[in-house]
């Protein structure tokens, strides 16, 4: 998983 994936997940949360 890349940092973009984590950033997107944080936005969803």
Swiss-Prot record:
Single GO biological process annotation from the record: killing of cells of another organism
Sequence positions bearing Leucine amide: 13
Tissue spec: Expressed by the venom gland.
Record keyword Coiled coil present: no
Gene Ontology CC terms: extracellular region
Localisation: Secreted
Keywords carried by this UniProt record: Amidation, Antibiotic, Antimicrobial, Fungicide, G-protein coupled receptor impairing toxin, Immunity, Innate immunity, Mast cell degranulation, Secreted, Toxin
A GO molecular-function annotation: toxin activity
Homology family: Belongs to the MCD family. Mastoparan subfamily.
Function, in words: Antimicrobial and mast cell degranulating peptide. Shows antimicrobial activity against the Gram-negative bacteria E.coli ATCC 25922 (MIC=15 ug/ml), the Gram-positive bacteria S.aureus ATCC 2592 (MIC=3.7 ug/ml) and the fungus C.albicans ATCC 2002 (MIC=7.5 ug/ml). Has little hemolytic activity. Its mast cell degranulation activity may be related to the activation of G-protein coupled receptors in mast cells as well as interaction with other proteins located in cell endosomal membranes in the mast cells.
Protein name in the entry: Mastoparan-like peptide 12b
Source organism per UniProt: Vespa magnifica (Hornet)
